[in-house]
Amino acid sequence: MANPEKAAAVAELKDLFSNSHAAVLTEYRGLTVAQLKTLRRALGENAEYAVVKNTLTAIAARESGIEAFEGQLNGPSAIAFVSGDAVEAAKSLRDFAKDNPQLVVKGGYLDGVAMDENEIKKLADLESREVLLSKVAGAAKASMSKAAALFQAPLSKTVRTADALRAKLDEQGENAA
C-alpha cells in the first residue's frame, strides 16, 4: 500500500477484527456526533464503534479472512466491533435504532459466520448469555433432582423390604425359642 496512513488504518482495522468475535456493520447517515457518542456509550466497554472507510475496511476484512461485509460496504459505514456479549451489543444497537431511525444495521458476523440484518435482529431478541446459562443450569439441576429421586425410590423400597424381612425373621426366631 503506497500511503503509510492507509496502511496503518488497515493494520488497525485488522487488529480490531482479530480482537473481536463479532462485528455489526451499520450506516450512520444523518446521525450527529452527539448521537454517535451516545451510541458508543450504550454499547459499553465490550464493544468499540468505529466509523470506517469502505475500501480500507474491505481490504482489512479480506486480509483477516472475513467475508461477511462483501457487497455491503457502501455509503457512510461504521462497525461495532464486539469483544464481549454479542447479544447485549445487538440489543444496544436495536434500542438505539428505535430512537434514531437514521442508524441502519446492514449485517455482520458472529464467530466467523456471516449474518444479515434479520439474523442480527433475532440475535438482539435472545436473552443474555448469563440468563441462558442460568436456565440451562436450572434445567440440569431439576433433571438431576428427578434422577436422584428415581434412583432413591427403588433403593428405599429395598431397604424397607429388608427391614421388614429382618423383623419377621427376628420375630420367628423369638417364637421358636
UniProtKB/Swiss-Prot annotation:
Cite a single Pfam family from the UniProt record: Ribosomal_L10
Which GO terms of type biological process are on file?
A: translation
The protein's UniProt keywords, in alphabetical order, are: Ribonucleoprotein, Ribosomal protein, RNA-binding, rRNA-binding
InterPro entries according to UniProt: Ribosomal_uL10, Ribosomal_uL10-like_sf, Ribosomal_uL10_bac, Ribosomal_uL10_bac_type, Ribosomal_uL10_CS_bac
Question: What are the annotated GO cellular component locations?
Answer: large ribosomal subunit
Q: Which molecular function terms from Gene Ontology are attached?
A: large ribosomal subunit rRNA binding; structural constituent of ribosome
Which Gene3D superfamilies does UniProt cross-reference here? 3.30.70.1730, 6.10.250.290
**Is Ribonucleoprotein tagged as a keyword?**
yes
Give the record's family classification. Belongs to the universal ribosomal protein uL10 family.
The subunit structure is: Part of the ribosomal stalk of the 50S ribosomal subunit. The N-terminus interacts with L11 and the large rRNA to form the base of the stalk. The C-terminus forms an elongated spine to which L12 dimers bind in a sequential fashion forming a multimeric L10(L12)X complex.
| PANTHER family named in the record | 39S RIBOSOMAL PROTEIN L10, MITOCHONDRIAL
Protein function = Forms part of the ribosomal stalk, playing a central role in the interaction of the ribosome with GTP-bound translation factors.
Q: What is this protein called?
A: Large ribosomal subunit protein uL10
Its source organism is: Kocuria rhizophila (strain ATCC 9341 / DSM 348 / NBRC 103217 / DC2201)
Q: What is the lineage of its organism?
A: Bacteria, Bacillati, Actinomycetota, Actinomycetes, Micrococcales
